[in-house]
Amino acid sequence: MIDAHDLASWMIDLAERRLTGVYNATGPDYPLSIGRVLEESKAESGSDAVLNWVPAEFLEQQALQAWQDLPAWVPDVGEYRGFFRVDCRRTVAAGLTCRPLRDTIRETREWAATFTPDHEWRAGLSRARERAALAAWHARQGRP
């Protein structure tokens, strides 16, 4: 995951320095899991949300597709194995810097707050589909 501000700033810097080449601009120079993003999001927002970690097989049973229904997530199996493990050292050496994750989260939350609470996002699951998937998961786990 990379903050668009960081990417844009770096690209302008490259142009000003007349640097060209192939770069993997995928995020910070450390491993960043979706779990960490979600935990940091909870902490930044003060949310008491409960994260439900479910196996990829369950998502498939619910007809939830990697990347389509769940943006920024793919199972680490088969054709997707290693999908998010991209070496970006060359990019960092060329000057890419990434702001702290919590800054990106805070700015994204501020932007999202400009929409009405009932706004239906075009990316990701609808509220109804999310509720149905969670209900199925909780039923499978014997929880209400």
Language-model-derived ranges and their functions:
Residues 97, 101-103, 111-116:
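Acyl-CoA thioester-binding alpha/beta core of soluble enzymes
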Residues 13-79, 87-89, 106-109, 116-144:
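Mid/C-terminal beta-alpha module of Rossmann-like enzyme folds, strongest
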Residues 1-7, 100:
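A conserved structural motif in NAD(P)-dependent oxidoreductases
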Residues 92-96:
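Short, well-ordered beta-strand elements within core beta-sheets of diverse protein domains
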